[in-house]
Swiss-Prot record:
Residue sites binding DNA per the record: R295, R314, R319
Subcellular localization(s) per the UniProt record: Cytoplasm
Protein name, entry field: Holliday junction branch migration complex subunit RuvB
CDD domains to which the protein is assigned, alphabetical: AAA (cd00009)
EC number in record: 3.6.4.-
Catalytic activity of the protein: ATP + H2O = ADP + phosphate + H(+)
Assembly and oligomerization: Homohexamer. Forms an RuvA(8)-RuvB(12)-Holliday junction (HJ) complex. HJ DNA is sandwiched between 2 RuvA tetramers; dsDNA enters through RuvA and exits via RuvB. An RuvB hexamer assembles on each DNA strand where it exits the tetramer. Each RuvB hexamer is contacted by two RuvA subunits (via domain III) on 2 adjacent RuvB subunits; this complex drives branch migration. In the full resolvosome a probable DNA-RuvA(4)-RuvB(12)-RuvC(2) complex forms which resolves the HJ.
Length: 333
């Protein structure tokens, strides 16, 4: 329902953002910043598979949106020297959709399924023998005369990505030989990421300017790259194209993104709890009515980061604004 353009949203990129994102996306593991536990493990797994001449084990990547699951899938395929075919769970409506992709894979190729938790049960059933035995079971005909035939598939790697690992069925989850969780990024890692992005886009960005962007990026590369693009516009008009501390702070203030990465929607929610409901507890329906949003928007879009950062607590009686929330507004955000 929500129809607002939030800079701190982790929503999928629009077409223009996606074009820029592809230009700045790292291609190799040695360019991949942060997630050192993932990078070190994948380096070993990839090297071992290449030495044996095998396809890499099936890989499940999970974690919050915007942390680079698609980027990692592309890096894995590049490091393995294989093709990557890309699709998503909602797109694969029929078993035949998946069969068409699987039968066109070359040996050791990778198939990337984003939002794999949204696969239909019918399509998921096709995946089981494909992942385990590199075989495709296809039903020919209908009714009493229907028969099953098996097609051999070349060894391949399935790379699944999801924000909801808990929504995967056990049979599917258990067929992934490698499971990697992506964590939120530290401020130093985000500074490194945005500095690299600025170099790729030929934008002058100072170290302190990068720090200001990193502080407001909610631990998420997708957000920091989006902020960089918008601050660039401000810098070109107000700062001769250079992004330093002063320009970064002024631009982000104009864009209503404060030093903890909260935007006007976050502030609106927190101030409603504090001012209209004396800090809570307040039920979700009352809160939704107070700020003019749907309860699903609050639950799925606004609340997760505020809870994670300790601004809100969920209780059996409703939402409560924490001391951290009060302090945030006392100190001016």
């Amino acid at each position: 329902m929500i129809e607002i353009d939030r800079l701190v949203s982790t929503d999928v990129l629009n077409e223009n953002e996606a074009l820029v994102d592809r230009a700045i996306r790292p291609k190799r593991l040695d360019e991949y910043v942060g997630q050192s536990h993932v990078r070190d493990q994948m380096q070993i797994f990839i090297q071992a598979a290449k030495q044996r001449g095998d396809a890499l084990d099936h890989l499940l990547i999970f974690g919050p949106p915007g942390l680079g699951k698609t980027t990692l899938a592309n890096i894995v395929a590049h490091e393995m020297g294989v093709n990557l075919r890309t699709t998503s769970g909602p797109v694969l409506e029929k078993a035949g959709d998946l069969a068409a992709l699987l039968t066109h894979l070359e040996p050791r190729d990778a198939l990337f399924i984003d939002e794999i938790h949204r696969l239909s049960p019918v399509v998921e059933e096709i995946l089981y023998p494909a992942m385990e035995d590199y075989q495709l079971d296809i039903m020919i005909g209908e009714g009493p005369g229907a028969r099953s035939i098996k097609l051999d598939l070349p060894p391949f790697t399935l790379i699944g990505a999801t924000t909801r690992a808990g929504s995967l069925t056990s049979p599917l989850r258990d067929r992934f030989g490698i499971v990697q969780r992506l964590e939120f990024y530290s401020v130093p890692d985000l500074e490194h990421i945005v500095s690299r992005s600025a170099r790729c886009l030929q934008l002058p960005l100072t170290k302190n300017g990068a720090h200001q962007l990193a502080l407001r990026s909610r631990g998420t590369p997708r957000i920091i790259n989006r902020l960089l693009r918008r601050v660039r516009d401000f810098a070109e008009v107000k700062g001769e194209g250079k992004i330093n501390t002063e320009i970064a702070i002024k631009a982000l203030e104009m864009l209503n993104v404060d030093k903890e990465g909260l935007d006007y929607m976050d502030s609106k929610l927190l101030l409603a709890i504090i001012e209209k409901f004396q800090g809570g507890p307040v039920g979700l329906d009352n809160l939704a009515a107070a700020i003019g949003e749907e309860r699903e928007t609050i639950e799925d879009v606004l609340e997760p980061y505020l809870i994670q950062q300790g601004f809100i607590q969920r209780t059996p009686r409703g939402r409560i604004a924490t001391q951290h929330a009060y302090q945030h507004f006392i100190c001016g955000g």
